[in-house]
Amino acid sequence: MNKLALYCRIGFEKETAAEITEKAAEKGVFGFARVNNDSGYVIFECYQEGEADRLAREIPFNQLIFARQMIVISDLLENLPPTDRITPIIEEYNRIGSLVNLHRTTELFVETADTNEAKELSVFCRKFTVPLRQALKKQGYLAFKEVKKSGLTLHIFFVKPNCCYVGYSYNNNHSPNFMGILRLKFPPQAPSRSTLKLHEAILTFLSPEEERKCMNESMYGVDLGACPGGWTYQLVKRGLFVYAVDHGKMAASLHDTGRIDHCPEDGFKFQPPKRSKIDWLVCDMVEQPIRIAALIAKWLVNEWCRESIFNLKLPMKKRYAEVQNCLQLITNELDKAGFKYHIQAKHLYHDREEITVHISVKK
Protein backbone atom coordinates (compact mmCIF):
# COMPACT_ATOMS: atom_id res chain seq x y z
CA MET A 1 0.00 0.00 0.00
CA ASN A 2 1.43 3.34 -1.00
CA LYS A 3 -1.42 5.85 -0.78
CA LEU A 4 -2.85 8.24 1.79
CA ALA A 5 -6.31 9.77 1.69
CA LEU A 6 -6.66 13.13 3.38
CA TYR A 7 -10.09 14.68 3.91
CA CYS A 8 -10.43 18.46 3.79
CA ARG A 9 -12.91 21.27 3.33
CA ILE A 10 -14.03 21.65 -0.28
CA GLY A 11 -11.96 24.30 -2.03
CA PHE A 12 -8.86 23.56 0.06
CA GLU A 13 -7.58 20.55 -1.84
CA LYS A 14 -4.53 22.38 -3.22
CA GLU A 15 -3.49 23.55 0.24
CA THR A 16 -3.92 20.03 1.64
CA ALA A 17 -1.85 18.63 -1.23
CA ALA A 18 0.92 21.19 -0.80
CA GLU A 19 1.10 20.54 2.92
CA ILE A 20 1.24 16.74 2.77
CA THR A 21 3.81 16.88 -0.05
CA GLU A 22 6.01 19.14 2.07
CA LYS A 23 5.59 17.09 5.27
CA ALA A 24 6.33 13.85 3.43
CA ALA A 25 9.49 15.31 1.88
CA GLU A 26 10.68 16.31 5.36
CA LYS A 27 10.51 12.60 6.22
CA GLY A 28 12.42 11.67 3.07
CA VAL A 29 9.28 10.29 1.42
CA PHE A 30 8.42 11.43 -2.08
CA GLY A 31 5.34 11.09 -4.22
CA PHE A 32 2.60 13.11 -5.85
CA ALA A 33 -0.85 14.34 -4.90
CA ARG A 34 -3.95 13.63 -6.97
CA VAL A 35 -6.20 16.68 -6.68
CA ASN A 36 -9.74 17.18 -7.94
CA ASN A 37 -11.02 20.66 -7.18
CA ASP A 38 -13.96 20.84 -4.75
CA SER A 39 -13.83 17.08 -4.13
CA GLY A 40 -13.19 17.42 -0.39
CA TYR A 41 -10.21 15.07 -0.36
CA VAL A 42 -6.70 14.48 -1.70
CA ILE A 43 -4.94 11.21 -2.57
CA PHE A 44 -1.18 11.28 -1.94
CA GLU A 45 0.64 8.48 -3.73
CA CYS A 46 4.12 7.54 -2.52
CA TYR A 47 6.70 6.22 -4.97
CA GLN A 48 7.67 3.35 -2.64
CA GLU A 49 5.46 0.64 -1.15
CA GLY A 50 4.96 0.85 2.61
CA GLU A 51 5.78 4.53 2.86
CA ALA A 52 2.15 5.60 3.23
CA ASP A 53 1.97 3.57 6.44
CA ARG A 54 5.16 5.20 7.65
CA LEU A 55 3.76 8.69 6.98
CA ALA A 56 0.53 7.82 8.81
CA ARG A 57 2.62 6.91 11.85
CA GLU A 58 5.33 9.56 11.72
CA ILE A 59 3.71 12.80 10.50
CA PRO A 60 2.04 14.24 13.63
CA PHE A 61 -1.59 14.60 12.61
CA ASN A 62 -2.08 17.51 15.01
CA GLN A 63 0.56 19.43 13.05
CA LEU A 64 -1.35 19.13 9.77
CA ILE A 65 -3.35 22.31 9.24
CA PHE A 66 -5.72 21.53 6.38
CA ALA A 67 -6.28 17.76 6.68
CA ARG A 68 -9.34 16.64 8.63
CA GLN A 69 -8.28 12.99 8.53
CA MET A 70 -5.29 10.93 7.38
CA ILE A 71 -5.84 7.34 6.21
CA VAL A 72 -3.66 4.67 4.62
CA ILE A 73 -5.67 3.31 1.68
CA SER A 74 -5.72 0.56 -0.92
CA ASP A 75 -6.14 1.07 -4.63
CA LEU A 76 -9.67 2.09 -5.56
CA LEU A 77 -12.10 -0.84 -5.52
CA GLU A 78 -14.31 -0.32 -8.57
CA ASN A 79 -17.47 -1.95 -9.92
CA LEU A 80 -18.50 -3.39 -6.57
CA PRO A 81 -21.52 -5.65 -7.17
CA PRO A 82 -24.68 -3.99 -5.78
CA THR A 83 -25.80 -7.32 -4.32
CA ASP A 84 -22.52 -7.99 -2.47
CA ARG A 85 -20.20 -5.09 -1.78
CA ILE A 86 -19.01 -6.69 1.46
CA THR A 87 -17.05 -9.65 0.07
CA PRO A 88 -14.54 -7.60 -2.00
CA ILE A 89 -14.00 -5.29 0.99
CA ILE A 90 -13.35 -8.23 3.33
CA GLU A 91 -10.97 -9.75 0.78
CA GLU A 92 -9.07 -6.46 0.56
CA TYR A 93 -8.78 -6.21 4.34
CA ASN A 94 -7.51 -9.80 4.49
CA ARG A 95 -4.85 -8.83 1.95
CA ILE A 96 -3.93 -5.72 3.95
CA GLY A 97 -3.83 -7.87 7.08
CA SER A 98 -0.75 -9.64 5.72
CA LEU A 99 1.06 -6.28 5.95
CA VAL A 100 -0.50 -4.67 9.02
CA ASN A 101 -1.98 -6.27 12.14
CA LEU A 102 -5.64 -5.42 11.61
CA HIS A 103 -6.66 -7.55 14.60
CA ARG A 104 -5.70 -4.45 16.62
CA THR A 105 -8.67 -2.57 15.14
CA THR A 106 -11.27 -0.95 17.39
CA GLU A 107 -13.71 0.98 15.21
CA LEU A 108 -15.20 1.18 11.72
CA PHE A 109 -16.03 4.37 9.83
CA VAL A 110 -17.87 4.13 6.49
CA GLU A 111 -17.42 7.61 5.07
CA THR A 112 -17.71 9.97 2.12
CA ALA A 113 -16.22 13.35 1.33
CA ASP A 114 -17.95 16.33 2.95
CA THR A 115 -19.65 17.66 -0.19
CA ASN A 116 -23.25 18.38 -1.18
CA GLU A 117 -22.99 15.74 -3.90
CA ALA A 118 -22.00 13.09 -1.35
CA LYS A 119 -24.97 13.64 0.97
CA GLU A 120 -27.10 11.04 -0.79
CA LEU A 121 -24.18 8.63 -0.71
CA SER A 122 -23.78 9.21 3.04
CA VAL A 123 -27.29 7.80 3.60
CA PHE A 124 -26.17 4.58 1.95
CA CYS A 125 -22.99 4.56 4.06
CA ARG A 126 -24.99 4.67 7.29
CA LYS A 127 -27.12 1.72 6.21
CA PHE A 128 -24.10 -0.22 4.97
CA THR A 129 -22.12 0.20 8.19
CA VAL A 130 -24.05 -2.31 10.34
CA PRO A 131 -23.82 -5.37 8.04
CA LEU A 132 -20.21 -4.57 7.19
CA ARG A 133 -19.28 -4.26 10.87
CA GLN A 134 -20.89 -7.64 11.58
CA ALA A 135 -18.98 -9.25 8.70
CA LEU A 136 -15.68 -7.75 9.85
CA LYS A 137 -16.22 -8.98 13.41
CA LYS A 138 -16.74 -12.51 12.08
CA GLN A 139 -13.26 -12.20 10.57
CA GLY A 140 -11.82 -11.28 13.98
CA TYR A 141 -11.56 -7.54 13.36
CA LEU A 142 -12.85 -4.67 15.56
CA ALA A 143 -12.46 -6.62 18.81
CA PHE A 144 -9.18 -5.17 20.11
CA LYS A 145 -9.23 -3.94 23.72
CA GLU A 146 -7.27 -0.74 23.34
CA VAL A 147 -4.77 0.70 25.83
CA LYS A 148 -3.60 4.32 25.38
CA LYS A 149 -4.80 4.63 21.77
CA SER A 150 -2.70 1.68 20.65
CA GLY A 151 -5.24 0.40 18.14
CA LEU A 152 -6.33 1.20 14.60
CA THR A 153 -9.57 2.37 13.01
CA LEU A 154 -10.88 0.85 9.78
CA HIS A 155 -12.11 3.31 7.14
CA ILE A 156 -14.18 2.65 4.04
CA PHE A 157 -14.13 5.77 1.87
CA PHE A 158 -16.87 5.72 -0.77
CA VAL A 159 -16.51 8.04 -3.76
CA LYS A 160 -19.42 6.42 -5.66
CA PRO A 161 -22.00 3.77 -4.64
CA ASN A 162 -19.91 1.09 -6.38
CA CYS A 163 -16.43 2.53 -5.76
CA CYS A 164 -14.51 2.84 -2.51
CA TYR A 165 -11.08 2.96 -0.95
CA VAL A 166 -10.36 0.50 1.88
CA GLY A 167 -8.00 1.65 4.59
CA TYR A 168 -7.06 2.32 8.17
CA SER A 169 -5.73 5.01 10.49
CA TYR A 170 -3.71 4.92 13.70
CA ASN A 171 -5.75 5.86 16.77
CA ASN A 172 -2.82 7.73 18.32
CA ASN A 173 -2.36 9.86 15.19
CA HIS A 174 -5.71 10.67 13.60
CA SER A 175 -8.98 12.48 14.18
CA PRO A 176 -11.26 10.36 16.38
CA ASN A 177 -14.30 11.97 14.75
CA PHE A 178 -16.39 10.49 11.94
CA MET A 179 -15.22 12.05 8.64
CA GLY A 180 -12.75 14.04 10.75
CA ILE A 181 -15.54 16.46 11.69
CA LEU A 182 -16.28 17.69 15.21
CA ARG A 183 -19.97 18.62 15.02
CA LEU A 184 -21.28 20.97 17.70
CA LYS A 185 -24.73 22.27 18.56
CA PHE A 186 -25.20 26.02 18.55
CA PRO A 187 -25.96 27.22 22.11
CA PRO A 188 -29.10 29.41 21.90
CA GLN A 189 -27.70 31.81 24.53
CA ALA A 190 -24.68 32.68 22.35
CA PRO A 191 -24.82 36.04 20.52
CA SER A 192 -23.51 34.69 17.17
CA ARG A 193 -22.64 31.46 15.38
CA SER A 194 -18.96 32.42 15.46
CA THR A 195 -19.03 31.03 19.01
CA LEU A 196 -18.76 27.53 17.50
CA LYS A 197 -15.31 28.33 16.10
CA LEU A 198 -13.84 29.06 19.51
CA HIS A 199 -15.70 26.14 21.09
CA GLU A 200 -14.25 23.76 18.50
CA ALA A 201 -10.81 25.32 18.89
CA ILE A 202 -10.81 24.76 22.66
CA LEU A 203 -11.87 21.13 22.22
CA THR A 204 -9.25 20.64 19.48
CA PHE A 205 -6.25 22.32 21.09
CA LEU A 206 -6.81 21.60 24.80
CA SER A 207 -7.41 18.34 26.61
CA PRO A 208 -10.26 18.37 29.17
CA GLU A 209 -7.66 18.55 31.94
CA GLU A 210 -5.85 21.47 30.26
CA GLU A 211 -9.13 23.29 29.76
CA ARG A 212 -10.03 22.98 33.45
CA LYS A 213 -6.57 24.15 34.48
CA CYS A 214 -6.20 27.00 31.98
CA MET A 215 -9.75 28.31 31.68
CA ASN A 216 -11.50 28.96 34.99
CA GLU A 217 -12.84 31.60 37.39
CA SER A 218 -9.36 32.80 38.35
CA MET A 219 -8.45 33.73 34.77
CA TYR A 220 -8.69 36.95 32.76
CA GLY A 221 -9.16 37.20 29.01
CA VAL A 222 -9.18 39.80 26.25
CA ASP A 223 -11.35 39.45 23.14
CA LEU A 224 -10.20 41.75 20.32
CA GLY A 225 -13.01 42.54 17.88
CA ALA A 226 -15.50 41.04 20.31
CA CYS A 227 -18.86 42.37 19.04
CA PRO A 228 -21.47 40.95 19.44
CA GLY A 229 -19.77 38.45 21.74
CA GLY A 230 -19.66 34.97 20.21
CA TRP A 231 -16.10 34.33 21.38
CA THR A 232 -16.52 36.25 24.63
CA TYR A 233 -19.44 33.93 25.41
CA GLN A 234 -17.16 30.86 25.37
CA LEU A 235 -14.71 32.49 27.80
CA VAL A 236 -17.41 33.76 30.16
CA LYS A 237 -19.07 30.34 30.08
CA ARG A 238 -15.82 28.90 31.47
CA GLY A 239 -15.67 31.49 34.24
CA LEU A 240 -13.16 33.99 32.83
CA PHE A 241 -13.50 37.75 33.28
CA VAL A 242 -13.22 39.25 29.79
CA TYR A 243 -12.20 42.64 28.46
CA ALA A 244 -14.35 42.79 25.32
CA VAL A 245 -12.69 45.19 22.88
CA ASP A 246 -14.88 46.54 20.07
CA HIS A 247 -16.57 49.79 19.03
CA GLY A 248 -19.77 47.82 18.42
CA LYS A 249 -22.35 46.77 20.98
CA MET A 250 -22.02 43.63 23.04
CA ALA A 251 -24.98 41.35 23.71
CA ALA A 252 -26.97 42.40 26.79
CA SER A 253 -26.89 38.81 28.05
CA LEU A 254 -23.10 39.06 28.41
CA HIS A 255 -23.31 42.34 30.33
CA ASP A 256 -25.81 40.66 32.65
CA THR A 257 -23.21 38.07 33.69
CA GLY A 258 -21.05 40.75 35.33
CA ARG A 259 -18.06 38.97 33.79
CA ILE A 260 -17.18 41.44 31.02
CA ASP A 261 -15.78 44.95 30.73
CA HIS A 262 -16.75 46.42 27.37
CA CYS A 263 -13.88 48.52 25.99
CA PRO A 264 -15.06 50.52 22.92
CA GLU A 265 -11.60 50.77 21.36
CA ASP A 266 -9.62 49.78 18.28
CA GLY A 267 -8.37 46.20 18.69
CA PHE A 268 -5.01 47.12 17.18
CA LYS A 269 -4.44 49.97 19.65
CA PHE A 270 -5.88 48.46 22.84
CA GLN A 271 -3.48 47.57 25.64
CA PRO A 272 -4.46 45.61 28.74
CA PRO A 273 -4.96 47.47 32.04
CA LYS A 274 -1.56 47.76 33.70
CA ARG A 275 -2.57 46.01 36.91
CA SER A 276 -4.38 43.17 35.18
CA LYS A 277 -2.73 39.82 34.45
CA ILE A 278 -4.19 38.60 31.17
CA ASP A 279 -4.18 34.85 30.73
CA TRP A 280 -5.94 34.55 27.37
CA LEU A 281 -6.07 36.67 24.23
CA VAL A 282 -8.64 35.67 21.61
CA CYS A 283 -9.19 37.39 18.29
CA ASP A 284 -11.51 36.85 15.32
CA MET A 285 -11.08 40.21 13.59
CA VAL A 286 -11.57 40.45 9.83
CA GLU A 287 -8.20 41.82 8.79
CA GLN A 288 -5.15 40.95 6.69
CA PRO A 289 -3.65 37.80 8.24
CA ILE A 290 -0.13 39.22 8.43
CA ARG A 291 -1.43 42.18 10.48
CA ILE A 292 -3.17 39.80 12.89
CA ALA A 293 0.01 37.71 13.16
CA ALA A 294 2.04 40.81 14.01
CA LEU A 295 -0.55 41.88 16.58
CA ILE A 296 -0.54 38.49 18.33
CA ALA A 297 3.26 38.43 18.32
CA LYS A 298 3.31 41.87 19.97
CA TRP A 299 1.00 40.71 22.76
CA LEU A 300 3.03 37.58 23.43
CA VAL A 301 6.46 39.23 23.28
CA ASN A 302 5.32 42.08 25.54
CA GLU A 303 4.00 39.44 27.97
CA TRP A 304 0.54 40.99 27.87
CA CYS A 305 -0.88 37.44 27.74
CA ARG A 306 0.33 33.87 28.15
CA GLU A 307 -1.90 32.07 25.70
CA SER A 308 -3.87 32.94 22.58
CA ILE A 309 -6.40 31.50 20.15
CA PHE A 310 -6.96 33.55 17.01
CA ASN A 311 -8.13 33.30 13.42
CA LEU A 312 -6.22 34.17 10.29
CA LYS A 313 -8.51 35.12 7.39
CA LEU A 314 -6.96 33.70 4.24
CA PRO A 315 -6.65 35.30 0.78
CA MET A 316 -8.09 33.62 -2.29
CA LYS A 317 -4.66 32.72 -3.71
CA LYS A 318 -1.46 31.29 -2.20
CA ARG A 319 -3.24 30.50 1.07
CA TYR A 320 -0.74 27.93 2.30
CA ALA A 321 2.15 30.30 1.62
CA GLU A 322 0.34 33.05 3.52
CA VAL A 323 -0.20 30.75 6.50
CA GLN A 324 3.49 29.85 6.52
CA ASN A 325 4.48 33.53 6.38
CA CYS A 326 2.21 34.41 9.30
CA LEU A 327 3.35 31.56 11.52
CA GLN A 328 6.98 32.26 10.65
CA LEU A 329 6.57 35.92 11.66
CA ILE A 330 5.23 34.90 15.06
CA THR A 331 7.82 32.21 15.75
CA ASN A 332 10.65 34.52 14.64
CA GLU A 333 9.53 37.17 17.13
CA LEU A 334 9.18 34.62 19.94
CA ASP A 335 12.59 33.12 19.17
CA LYS A 336 14.25 36.56 19.22
CA ALA A 337 12.64 37.32 22.57
CA GLY A 338 13.81 34.01 24.05
CA PHE A 339 10.40 32.43 24.62
CA LYS A 340 9.59 28.75 24.70
CA TYR A 341 6.29 28.12 22.97
CA HIS A 342 3.83 25.57 21.67
CA ILE A 343 1.99 26.42 18.46
CA GLN A 344 -0.73 24.53 16.62
CA ALA A 345 -2.93 25.58 13.70
CA LYS A 346 -6.00 23.91 12.22
CA HIS A 347 -8.58 24.54 9.55
CA LEU A 348 -11.55 23.72 11.76
CA TYR A 349 -14.91 22.44 10.57
CA HIS A 350 -16.60 25.67 11.70
CA ASP A 351 -13.97 27.82 9.98
CA ARG A 352 -14.61 29.11 6.48
CA GLU A 353 -11.87 30.90 4.50
CA GLU A 354 -9.68 31.00 7.60
CA ILE A 355 -7.62 28.90 9.98
CA THR A 356 -7.47 28.93 13.77
CA VAL A 357 -4.19 29.07 15.69
CA HIS A 358 -3.36 28.31 19.33
CA ILE A 359 -0.13 29.48 20.97
CA SER A 360 1.04 29.14 24.56
CA VAL A 361 4.31 30.71 25.73
CA LYS A 362 6.65 30.78 28.68
CA LYS A 363 10.06 32.28 29.33
From Swiss-Prot:
One of its GO terms (biological process) is rRNA processing. The keyword DNA repair does not apply. It catalyses: cytidine(2498) in 23S rRNA + S-adenosyl-L-methionine = 2'-O-methylcytidine(2498) in 23S rRNA + S-adenosyl-L-homocysteine + H(+). Its main location: cytoplasm. Pfam families: FtsJ, RlmM_FDX, RLMM_N. Disulfide bonds: none annotated. S-adenosyl-L-methionine binds at S194, C227, P228, G229, G230, D246, D266, D284. Gene3D superfamilies: 3.30.2300.20, 3.30.70.2810, Vaccinia Virus protein VP39. Its EC number is 2.1.1.186. The keyword Ligase does not apply. It is found in: Cytoplasm. Coiled coil: none annotated. The active site is at K313 (proton acceptor). It comes from the Bacteria. GO terms for molecular function: S-adenosylmethionine-dependent methyltransferase activity. GO terms for cellular component: cytoplasm. Keywords: Cytoplasm, Methyltransferase, rRNA processing, S-adenosyl-L-methionine, Transferase. It is an enzyme of class 2 (transferase). NCBIfam families: PRK11760.1. HAMAP family: 23SrRNA_methyltr_M. Catalyzes the 2'-O-methylation at nucleotide C2498 in 23S rRNA. Monomer. Belongs to the class I-like SAM-binding methyltransferase superfamily. RNA methyltransferase RlmE family. RlmM subfamily. This is Ribosomal RNA large subunit methyltransferase M. The gene is rlmM.
